[in-house]
Every structure is written in structure tokens, then in C-alpha cells.
From Swiss-Prot:
Annotated ranges, domain ATP-grasp: 117-306
Protein's pathway: Purine metabolism; IMP biosynthesis via de novo pathway; N(2)-formyl-N(1)-(5-phospho-D-ribosyl)glycinamide from N(1)-(5-phospho-D-ribosyl)glycinamide (formate route): step 1/1
Residues engaged in binding ATP: 112, 153, 158-163, 193-196, 201
Record key words, sorted: ATP-binding, Ligase, Magnesium, Metal-binding, Nucleotide-binding, Purine biosynthesis
GO biological process, one term: 'de novo' IMP biosynthetic process
Binding-site positions, N(1)-(5-phospho-beta-D-ribosyl)glycinamide: 20-21, 80, 284, 352, 359-360
Stated family: Belongs to the PurK/PurT family.
Binding site for Mg(2+): 265, 277
Quaternary assembly: Homodimer.
SUPFAM superfamilies referenced in this protein's UniProt entry, alphabetically: Glutathione synthetase ATP-binding domain-like, PreATP-grasp domain, Rudiment single hybrid motif
Lineage of source species: Archaea, Methanobacteriati, Methanobacteriota, Methanomada group, Methanococci
Role this protein plays: Involved in the de novo purine biosynthesis. Catalyzes the transfer of formate to 5-phospho-ribosyl-glycinamide (GAR), producing 5-phospho-ribosyl-N-formylglycinamide (FGAR). Formate is provided by PurU via hydrolysis of 10-formyl-tetrahydrofolate.
Record-given protein name: Formate-dependent phosphoribosylglycinamide formyltransferase
Length: 388
């Protein structure tokens, strides 16, 4: 049951992190009459622009986080980013607050060490070989054991920040410094991963609901510098490999528990499926579902956490392509007239208050009778949008 927003009987969601994904979650939750409060570390974040109210705090600060939760007394606490004090979330959950999907799942998936150890050491899922390092000397030793080439990532970061590929020993120090500069949270620990020459990588959106687990069609995607660049749905997979992917996704999401959508990232090499990462919330590559599915990943997430039924049916092949800034500017302007002329496409601008070089400012979406055409159209639209 839901009440009326801004009245005493309102059902309240407190969103921790107010980026473009959270913005869409709030829009979907508001369609069901849910009162939405957005929280982030800076003013005018995308989700704040559509929320009933917002707060600006450092979410890594235990006292500040506890204070805003106790002030708002939400029915659901919905994390959207990694930079959150997860120990405080566990405390609040023990005091009766509901963290989506669970506080433990949030804590485990916020750092690559926790989720990698869970996937490989506890559940026995196939992963890339990995080591952890807390200083430069340990990193050099780990690289020697893993072998070159290999991947270096902070154990806590987002959107590919801090990620490097080691191609020779001379790259190690630069990679270490870059990882430290981009790390979110406390400490400087990094993960060293085996470089896998996979055939392709997918996101398998996995919805845990009161009615059971549902899988969206696989989403293919390409990353540039470790960050999502374009995605498409469906990505073709043979039935046995798809079944392996679903089995792996169910195993990891069942262990994490709770309700909501999970973005499970997987590599595929020949007919083998290799676990990469999992996010207990909507995934950036899943923005394509805004045009490909009956219900977008955002609607599915909102419905699942509210205990409502979901539909994962696909209605059309489609694609997404990021719109990135090439300039640094406060309150940028967008030329979208030419881009809006392209048939069967949509533009979603996120409303970020400042444009930075390489920052994701929007996404172009396209549908077609096949994903190849959709990818071409989405890329065309993305490049037609001019940020000034």
C-alpha cells in the first residue's frame, strides 16, 4: 500500500546518490505515488531535479548519513552509488530501516574485493585470476604473479575511473598513482586482474521479486577506458551459454538477497561464462531498456522494491550510445534540433550542472528491426548533439 506524497501517510524512498540512473528510478517511483528524497554531495544533481526534496551531505560521513536517515525516516533506503558509509547502513538496518536490496549486499558490492571473494571463494564461480595490493611493492609482486598484460582497478570506484591496463612493467607506477587518485572510500587497495581476451561481454539484468527471479534479454556493450560507451539489446547468445549466464546470475543474486534489479556483468569466451561484477541497482548499460522493453530497468527496480509484479518482455531491438562532453562549462547548453530529426530515436539529457571533458551528459536511444541498425542510429544521434 502507498499513501500520498508529502502527507503523513506517504511511502518514502530515500535515494543515496542522485545521478542519471537514480533520476529515472525516482520518476518511476513517483508514478506510484511514492514520496522521493534525493541525497548527494553536490547541488542540482540529476535526481534532485525531479525529487520532492533533497539533501546535500557527504554520504561517507557516518554522522551525516545517520542524521538524514533519522530525519526523513524513509520506508526504503535505495543506494545508487558506491561512495556511501555502508557500515552505517548496516547499523540502520539493524535498527529497523529497510535498505535495498539489503545492507550486506550493498556493502559487498561497493568494493571489488568483497564481491570477488564472494563469487570465487564462496560460490565457486569462474572469474578472472586476481590479486590484491595495498602498496606499490605489493602491486609489482601481484603483477608478476598474474602476468602481463593485466588490469589494475581501485577496489572502490565507478565508471571506469582509476582503471588501467598494464602492458609492461614501466606502466605499473603510473597505474598505481592513477588508481589511488580515483579511489572512492577509505584506503588505496587495488585489485589486479588477469587480462581475458573474451569474445564479448554482457550485462544480464536480473530482477529479484516477490514472485521469483526474472531475467531480461542479454545486453551487449562496449566500454571505452573502462566506462560504458554503447549498449544494445538483445545480444545474441546460444541457448546453453545463455542458460549458464542465467544460472550464474541467479546464484550470485540469491546470495546477495533482497528485492530489486541487479546488473550482472559477465564475460563470454567460447561457450564459457566468466563472472566480472554485479551492481545491486539499475545499470548504466541498461538505459537501452527505456526503448527496448515493456518495462525499463528503472520501472522494474521500482516495482520490485515496492513488491509489485514486473514484466521483462522485450518489444524491439534497440541500442544506446553515450553523449559525452568535449568541454568544461558550468550550466552547458545543448543543440539538439538536428539530432531530434532522426527517426525512431530518443534523446535523454541528464541535466548535470557542469560539463567536463569526457563526462557523460546524456544518452541517445534507438530502435530498429535489428541491433546493427539501432547502434548506427544511436551513434549518429549522440554525435549530432552539440554541447556548448
Amino acid at each position: 500500500m502507498v499513501g500520498t506524497p508529502l502527507f503523513s501517510n506517504a511511502k518514502k524512498i530515500l535515494l543515496l546518490g542522485s545521478g542519471e540512473l537514480g533520476k529515472e528510478v525516482i520518476i518511476e517511483a513517483q508514478r506510484f505515488g511514492v514520496e522521493c528524497i534525493a541525497v548527494d554531495s553536490y547541488e542540482n544533481a540529476p535526481a534532485m531535479q525531479v525529487a520532492h526534496k533533497y539533501h546535500i551531505i557527504d554520504m561517507k560521513d557516518a554522522g551525516a548519513l545517520r542524521a538524514v536517515i533519522e530525519k526523513e525516516k524513509p520506508d526504503l533506503i535505495v543506494p545508487e552509488i558506491e561512495a556511501i558509509n555502508t557500515d552505517t547502513l548496516k547499523e540502520m538496518e539493524s535498527e529497523g530501516y529497510h535498505v535495498v536490496p539489503t545492507a550486506n549486499a550493498t556493502k559487498l558490492t561497493m568494493d571489488r574485493e568483497g564481491i570477488r571473494r564472494l563469487a570465487f571463494e564462496k560460490l565457486g564461480l569462474r572469474t578472472a585470476k586476481y590479486e590484491f595490493a595495498e602498496n606499490l611493492e605489493e602491486l609489482k609482486e601481484a603483477v608478476t604473479r598474474i602476468g602481463i598484460p593485466c588490469i589494475i582497478k581501485p577496489i572502490m570506484s565507478s565508471s571506469g575511473k582509476g582503471q588501467s591496463t598494464i602492458k609492461s612493467e614501466s606502466d605499473i607506477k603510473t597505474a598505481w598513482n592513477y588508481a589511488k587518485s580515483a579511489a572512492r572510500g577509505i584506503g588505496t587497495k587495488v585489485i589486479v586482474e588477469e587480462f581475458i581476451k573474451f569474445d564479448y561481454e554482457i550485462t544480464l539484468l536480473t530482477a529479484r521479486t516477490a514472485e521469483g527471479t526474472r531475467f531480461c534479454e542479454p545486453i551487449g556493450h562496449i566500454q571505452v577506458d573502462g566506462d560504458y560507451h554503447e549498449s544494445w539489446q538483445p545480444h545474441p547468445m546460444c541457448a546453453p551459454t545463455k542458460a549458464k549466464a542465467q544460472e550464474m546470475a541467479k546464484k550470485i543474486t540469491d546470495e546477495l538477497g533482497g528485492y530489486g534489479i541487479f546488473g550482472v556483468e559477465l564475460f563470454v569466451l567460447d561457450d564459457e561464462v566468466i563472472f566480472s561484477e554485479v551492481s545491486p541497482r539499475p545499470h548504466d548499460t541498461g538505459m537501452v531498456t527505456m526503448v527496448t522493453q515493456k518495462m525499463s530497468e528503472f520501472e522494474i527496480h521500482a516495482r520490485a522494491i515496492l513488491g509489485l509484479p514486473v514484466n521483462v518482455d522485450i518489444v524491439s531491438p534497440g541500442a544506446s550510445h553515450v553523449i559525452k562532453s568535449e568541454i568544461l562549462k558550468w550550466a552547458p547548453e545543448y543543440e539538439i534540433h538536428e539530432a531530434s530529426k532522426v527517426k525512431d530515436t530518443k534523446i535523454r539529457l541528464f541535466g548535470k550542472p557542469i560539463a567536463k571533458v569526457g563526462r557523460r551528459m546524456g544518452v541517445a536511444l534507438a530502435v530498429s528491426d535489428d541491433v546493427i541498425k539501432a547502434r548506427e542510429h544511436a551513434e549518429k544521434v549522440a554525435h549530432l548533439v552539440k554541447i556548448k
